[in-house]
UniProtKB/Swiss-Prot annotation:
Residue span, FHA domain: 64-115
Chain's role: Required for normal spindle orientation at male meiosis II and normal formation of tetrad of microspores. Not involved in female meiosis.
Protein name according to UniProt: FHA domain-containing protein PS1
Phenotype upon loss of function: Diploid pollen grains (dyads of spores instead of tetrads) due to defective meiosis II. Abnormal spindle orientation at meiosis II.
Residue ranges, compositional bias (Basic and acidic residues): 589-607
């Protein structure tokens, strides 16, 4: 090697060697490869070019293109690199290299500076280049040409080599540090970072023992220790506070698979505080570990380490030397009692993990928990938020855990956990010790769990404290000063709760696995109490004995197997009694939460129990109230979405438990089952059944008899039932608690229904009416009853009897005091928040006091339908204008009845359900979406009776209209509208008054009339025309004295969010203007009749309200703008033509309607004719054009109704007008119909693979229709059957084309059509001349001429047959565009001669999707997401219009482009053929 190098040096000295540029590719500091920029001549003969540099090519400039395109010189495949990204120009003789960015999208960086598009930058040696979004770095070097061919010694630049060496040195240093850490077991830097996770990983290793770790993040091997170290910013161990921490391991391999761990930890004391240690010796000594400022959790962030965010103390026991004599070596013989002490630290996610692992010679304990490390036992205790549970420097005392395990029995072990409480200098905390053979009774903490602002822990499904204890022995070199009986006898003093320190109270961590080998916690008890009351710890033994030592708060023993219950305490500073339910992490089948209220009183206590856990099959929450009174308690039980498994979409209706509370005397059956079915169908998958059974010890609900109304709002939180988080807010428990705890009338339980109902957007809840009559008093609990449309049986409508209605009216009329309170207490916002999907919410708050109707046990609620609610709501309405002005109202009623001469006509307005279920209350609920507003004022029963009579009159008005639908007369509509206006005037306190609109705008419509509006559909438009004309001509008959001239208002029934069409409103206003400009009314002879007068009078009464649109019952029904254009154009055309005798004919009205009403202008008839001819033509549209599906009526009855109108109006003049309307509509819709394309295929377009891609993109596109001629199928079949080896590829393409046609026939049958044999036409040869020799000498040439061309005529080519097919379909469908797709130039020329558009499939597809093309099919569409709207139009035009030209200029090279000029002209002309510019 040295000889070669010397020779190379000599050659360099003699002659200058040619250098070439090389790019070294670096990624993450590692060299990936080198890119040598070598000329082709240099590559062919490196020796010659390497030895000498010729003068002629000294200034040769090499140009390289870099990009993603295959034609680039340097091909890079990163997706952020443009196809032609940058250009590199190099002059090797001068060692100059320049880079030019070719307007790349993501740019090019040289020396970390982005260069401008088309900007040229010189790159020097050592500079770096970054291309696009790629992380690779290209560093430029100049090397000798011969160096590039030295494959044995790859080129590495010194700069890159130093970088690689530095990286390797860093790796070696890190490995050395890790090895040192593993050898010395340095725990001084054990910190707990922002995630609040402290890992003390000490692996217990013995002969042949291996701990299988189930955690992903820890790597526990035989001689290696993995120590995750968090950020020390928050959780730091002060240097002065930690002197030494030593672990001493003593293992006895001779006895059994048991081991002892002695951990001796010495603790330093801070100047400001003293550390007190309490020890407990029960066969073993455990010393506490005290550290100052161990966890300052106030600043700690949420932890997401290891997926469960807990505080992990994984103590991996190692043999370590100890500076302290091992005092408990003799006690190693007692292998049944191993005690572990770990830092009881509080993480931010409220989890503490003490992992207990037992191992010995060949013993391995499998983990029961899928998340924990190797846990044989897991204790889960709910913790609170770190901002409350913070340990101050001086408030931290010793916390000791003493764990005793006995592995002699396989399924049983005992845990002794003793934790010494933290004390402030001014207070002390008792640690009750009870040493009974290794049993620990209690762990004293005062206010340990305060869940103020407790964050939800998305860790393992529950936010609880996990104590995964690794049983170890820990000792301290300090003396056992605290092993004093005085400490156990200390009294607990109640301290004010602060966010700076924790006052430990009693916490029971009791484990008993004798009954179950699944290591589930039997019970966890946490008692907390108000600061004002002292709490002495109560003890609980593992044997199951409960000893109560006088705790005045609730003692809640929670036995949970799969629910994690953590507390949520509101941010108020009130200290309320909380009952914390402990959990076990094992997801078992059923959870029983029993709440025992034992002796004691709790004043104004509030119990908040939130269930948030892993998949739960069934939760039985049983509430027992035992001797004692709870005054003013509020109970909200919330079930979090995580507590539901996504397997059973079931929701238990809360009324069932209410039935259990009230007893068999009050069966609540008002559509409870049907409503539960509806809810079950509406629920998304992911909610489990919650059965809540309430058991009351006394069997009855006793009320004190006051007439105060408590209002337990029973509702379901709605966002909780949304599909992503199926949550059910179980609020009936509060009703249960209220009814069962003897203070129903005392407490007004406002269970924050606003907070819950603002979430409820699209779920309806069902609550029953809870009415108790105890001691003769009526206790009324207010509720919201949601009546779903599906809850009513359409087949068997239950009609409420008149007697029950009178009873209801009498009850409400008599109890005016209660009624006023009910009316004033009504909250309409609840219904407004709940009403999102258009279900009718019936105000049962007025119906709830119907105690007389509710007294029967069997038919209490099943017989109550909305008629009762109607009567109640009617009685609670404010005084209408008829009450204020009775004389006028009576005149109105008598006038209406006498003029119309049909008092039995029913008011037919509604949503199509059974009309017997409809009442005034429900109608107002539909119209106003604000039920309670109408019932704010108490009304005497007399007005209720009168309103019921009015309602009865309205109900009786439907007898004639319920029959044939086409026998409608204008008087019927007039009566309906007049009664509607009467109702409008009576509803003053409605939703419109809140919005600043006059109350008379609102139309109250009952069932049949609304259905009729949906039936006739279009008839109200003509009525509005006549009304507008009458109002403009000032035909005023004083019916509404108090009516005002209102601004145009739109009536949108039954849908709160329905936005009316502004186009239709403009059209109606334009019609009114047109009518103003016309001549005066022409009255016919029959117009003087009383019928016409009455109809004019009633129409004039509504004429003061300007045009309104009635859109029937569908919130997504959008009026057709195309129809409106046709209507406007009809008006313009007929206005210019003037009056016509034919204009008085009305094809869509019955003959009798013409006889009754003849008061119209000629333009009115023309306008109505326009609207009706359109509707007459509309049912025929689906038969002819499939694209008109959006214009079809969306209601079920409308097709039948339009057919009935078609039959009823089948007169000659109607047919003439309709035919003219169809012709004019076809002319008007020409702009729309030109967007329909009939596509005829050629064989060449299917055999070309590139041409078939656009066809596949066109598949199923509305507005296009594909026709496949039969000759194309024949040709494809012939190609497929050809077995030629040379054309095997063509055979495969033909086979795939036939498969695609078959797939289209199956999947998109409406889109593709194969030409039928009857449609296929054959070319017929012309008849030859009779006498070929008749022309004398010219006969022979003629004969030869004929014979030469006769064979071609007899057998036409496939192109001719395809063209004939195209001409056939063009003549058949004149209103559609036809295009012939072919790549054959001959066929294109023939098609051009016939005037048929012929293009390639690619050109046709691009013309459809080009937004600047005349053929663009989505001109009226709305852009969604990122579309072309964010680019400049010029850029788009350049992109779309110049695409073909750029492609041709790119691929045509020189001579070939010149040779095809003529063909280009033909193709260019053809591509724009038929386009109208």
């Amino acid at each position: 090697m040295e000889v070669k190098e010397e020779k190379l040096m000599e050659e360099k000295q003699r002659l200058p060697e040619k250098t070439i540029p090389v790019f070294t590719v670096l990624k993450n500091g590692a060299i990936l490869k080198n890119i040598f920029v070598v000329n082709s001549r240099d590559f062919s003969s490196p020796e010659r070019n390497g030895s000498t540099v010729s003068d002629d090519d000294g200034e040769v400039e090499e140009i390289l293109v870099v990009g993603r395109h295959p034609d680039c010189d340097i091909l890079l495949t990163h997706p952020s690199i443009s196809r032609f990204h940058l250009e590199i120009r190099s002059i090797s003789s001068r060692q100059k290299l320049f880079v030019t960015d070719l307007s790349s999208v993501h740019g090019t960086w040289v020396r970390d500076l982005r260069i401008e598009p088309h900007g040229c930058v010189e790159v020097e040696e050592g500079d770096t280049i970054r291309i696009g979004g790629s992380t690779r770095i290209y560093r430029l070097h100049w090397i000798p040409l011969s160096r590039a061919y030295d494959l044995d010694n790859p080129f590495v630049s010194p700069l890159d080599a130093s970088t690689v060496l530095e990286q390797e040195e860093e790796n070696r240093m890190l490995e050395a540090e890790n090895l040192e850490v593993a050898q010395h077991q340095s725990l001084e830097n054990t910190t707990s970072g922002d995630e609040g996770v402290l890992h003390l990983d000490v692996t217990s290793e013995g002969t042949g023992s291996s701990v299988p770790s189930e955690d992903e993040d820890t790597y526990v091997t035989t001689r290696e220790m993995s120590m995750p170290v968090a950020s020390p910013s928050v959780l730091t161990l002060v240097r002065d506070s930690v002197e030494t921490q030593k672990l001493q391991f003593n293992e006895d391999l001779q006895t059994s698979p048991k081991w002892d761990l002695d951990v001796i930890e010495s603790v330093a004391e801070k100047l400001s505080g003293s550390f007190v240690r309490s020890t407990q010796q029960s066969g073993g000594d455990v010393e506490g570990l005290g550290c100052s400022e161990l966890f300052d959790a106030a600043e700690a962030d949420e932890c997401d380490v290891r997926g469960d965010g807990g505080l992990h103390l994984n103590v991996i026991s190692e043999k370590m030397e100890s500076s302290v004599p091992n005092m408990i070596e003799a006690e190693n013989l007692e292998v049944a009692q191993h005690q572990s002490l770990a830092n009881t630290a509080l993480g931010d996610d409220e989890d503490l993990h003490l992992d207990v692992t037992s191992e010995g010679t060949g013993s391995s304990v499998p983990s029961e928990d899928e998340d924990t490390y190797i846990t044989t036992m897991e204790i889960s205790v709910p913790l609170a938020s770190p901002n409350v549970l913070t340990l101050a420097r001086d408030s931290i005392k010793t916390q000791k855990l003493q764990s005793t395990q006995d592995f002699q029995t396989p399924t049983m072990w005992d845990l002794d956990v003793v934790e010494a409480a933290a004390e402030k200098p001014s207070s002390s905390c008792v640690l009750g010790k009870k040493l009974s053979g290794g049993y620990v009774e209690e762990l004293g903490c005062f206010e340990l769990f305060v869940a103020a602002e407790a964050d939800k822990c998305d860790v393992r499904g529950d936010g609880s404290l996990h104590l995964n204890e690794i049983s170890e022995r820990m000792e301290s070199s300090m003396s056992n000063k605290e092993d004093d009986p005085f400490l156990a006898a200390k009294e607990t003093s109640s301290l004010p709760l602060s966010t700076d320190f924790i006052n430990p109270e009693t916490l029971w961590l009791v484990e008993d696995v004798q009954a179950s080998p699944e290591f589930c916690t039997s019970s966890v008890k946490a008692n907390a109490e108000n600061p004002s009351s002292g709490c002495s710890p109560s003890t609980e033994q593992i044997d199951g004995c409960f000893e109560t030592s006088g705790c005045s708060a609730f003692d809640l023993a929670a036995e949970v197997e799969s629910l994690s219950l953590h507390q949520e305490v509101s941010e108020e500073t009130e200290f309320v009694t909380k009952e914390v339910m402990g959990v076990s992490s094992e997801p078992l089948g059923k959870a029983d939460i029993r709440s025992h209220e034992e002796n004691g009183e709790s004043e104004d206590s509030r119990q908040v129990i939130e269930v948030s856990a892993e998949p739960v099959a069934k939760a039985d929450i049983q509430s027992h109230e035992e001797n004692g009174e709870t005054e003013g308690s509020r109970q909200v039980i919330e079930v979090s979405p995580k507590s539901f498994s996504e397997a059973e979409p079931t929701i238990e209706i809360l009324t069932g438990e209410a039935q259990g509370i009230i007893g068999s005397e009050f069966p609540s059956e008002l559509a409870v089952e049907t409503e539960s079915e509806n809810l079950l169908h509406q629920k998304s998958i992911g909610e489990t059944k919650n059965e809540i059974r309430s058991h009351e010890d006394y069997g009855e609900t006793e009320d004190y008899g006051e007439t105060e109304c408590s209002w337990p709002d029973i509702a379901v939180s709605p966002s909780s039932v949304s599909p992503p988080e199926p949550t059910l807010e179980i609020l009936t428990d509060e009703a249960r608690g209220l009814l069962g705890s003897e203070f129903l009338s005392e407490v007004t339980v406002e269970t924050e229904i606003e907070n819950l109902l603002h979430q409820k957007s699209n779920v309806e809840t069902k609550a029953d009416i809870l009415i108790h009559e105890d001691y003769g008093e009526t206790e009324v609990s207010r509720q919201i009853i949601t009546v779903s449309p599906n809850s009513f049986s359409k087949a068997e409508p239950t009609l409420e009897t008149e007697d029950s209605r009178q009873q209801a009216r009498g009850l409400v009329g008599s109890d005016s005091e209660f009624q006023s309170e009910v009316a004033m207490k009504t909250e309409c916002e609840n219904l407004l928040n709940q009403k999102r999907n258009g279900e009718t919410k019936v105000s049962s708050r007025q119906a709830s006091p119907v105690s007389d109707c509710l007294s029967t046990p069997k038919d209490r609620l099943s017989s109550i339908n909305t008629d009762d609610i109607q009567s109640l709501c009617s009685s609670s309405q404010p005084p209408s204008e008829s009450e204020v002005n009775p004389a006028t109202d009576q005149d109105q009623e008598s006038g209406i009845i006498s003029e119309t001469e049909k008092p039995k006509t029913e008011l037919l307005i509604g949503s199509g359900r059974s009309e017997k279920y409809y009442s005034l209350s429900e109608i107002e609920g539909e119209e106003n979406t604000d039920i309670g507003r109408l019932s704010r004022c108490p009304i005497p029963s007399a007005l209720a009776a009168k309103t019921s009579e009015d309602t009865k009159l309205i109900e009786e008005l439907s007898s004639s209209d319920s029959g044939s639908q086409e026998n409608q007369t204008p008087e019927t509509h007039a009566v309906r509208d007049d009664v509607l206006c009467d109702m409008d005037s009576s509803s003053t306190c409605n939703i419109w008054s809140r919005r600043g609109k006059a109350a008379s705008v609102l139309k109250i419509r009952t069932n049949k009339s609304q259905g009729k509006q949906k039936q006739t559909g279009r008839q109200p438009k003509d009525k509005l025309h006549r009304k507008q004309a009458l109002s403009d001509k000032s035909i005023s008959l004083t019916i509404h004295h108090g009516a005002e001239i209102l601004e145009p208002e739109i009536f949108t029934p039954d849908k709160e969010n329905l936005t009316p069409s502004s186009h239709m409103l403009k059209r109606l206003q334009d019609i009114g203007d047109v009518k103003d400009s016309k001549s005066s009314l022409k009255l016919s002879g029959k117009s003087c009749s009383s019928l016409v007068h009455s109809s004019i009078a009633v129409l004039a009464s509504e004429a003061f309200t300007e045009p309104e649109i009635f859109t029937p019952d569908k919130e997504n029904l959008t009026p057709s703008s195309h129809m409106l254009k046709r209507l406007r154009e009809f008006g313009d055309i007929k206005d210019t033509k003037g009056s016509s005798s034919k204009a008085t004919r009305k094809p869509f009205f019955d003959i009798r309607m013409e006889e009754n009403v003849m008061v119209e202008q000629e333009p009115e008839d023309l306008h109505s004719l326009g609207s009706k001819s359109k509707l007459k033509h509309e049912p025929l549209a689906p038969k002819k054009k499939a694209e008109r599906a959006p214009f079809q009526p969306l209601l079920e009855k409308s097709s039948f109704q339009s057919q009935s109108y078609t039959e009823a109006s089948s007169t000659a003049s109607a047919r003439n007008n309709i035919s003219r309307g169809i012709r004019s509509s076809s002319n008007l819709s020409d702009a729309k119909s030109k967007m329909k394309w009939t596509i005829v295929l050629d064989t060449s377009s299917l055999l070309d693979k590139e041409s078939r891609k656009p066809l596949q993109l066109l598949q199923g596109l509305k507005g296009t229709h594909l026709v496949v001629p039969r000759t194309v199928l024949r040709e494809l079949n012939e190609v497929k059957r050809s077995r030629s080896f040379l054309f095997r590829r063509r055979t495969e393409i033909a086979s795939s084309a036939l498969d695609w046609i078959e797939e289209c026939k199956v999947n998109s049958k409406w889109w593709i059509q194969v030409q039928s044999p009857t449609e296929e036409t054959k070319a017929i040869a012309p008849t030859p001349p009779v006498t070929p020799q008749s022309n004398g000498s010219s006969a022979f040439p003629f004969s030869l001429h004929w014979n030469n061309y006769a064979p071609e005529i007899d057998s036409p080519t496939s192109e001719d047959q395809v063209l004939e097919c195209a001409l056939l379909y063009r003549n058949r469908n004149r209103d559609e565009k036809l295009v012939l797709l072919s790549n054959d130039v001959t066929l294109k020329i023939k098609a051009m001669a016939e005037g048929v558009i012929c293009e390639t499939p690619h050109e046709f597809y691009e013309s459809l999707v080009n937004p600047f093309s005349e053929r663009f099919m989505w001109t009226e569409s709305t852009a969604r997401g990122r579309t072309w709207s964010h680019l400049d139009n010029d850029v788009l035009r350049e992109r779309y219009n110049d695409r073909a030209c750029r492609r041709k200029s790119t691929y045509n090279r020189g001579e070939s482009g010149a040779a095809a000029k003529g063909l280009k002209l033909i193709l260019l002309h053809n591509s724009h053929y038929g386009h109208t510019h």
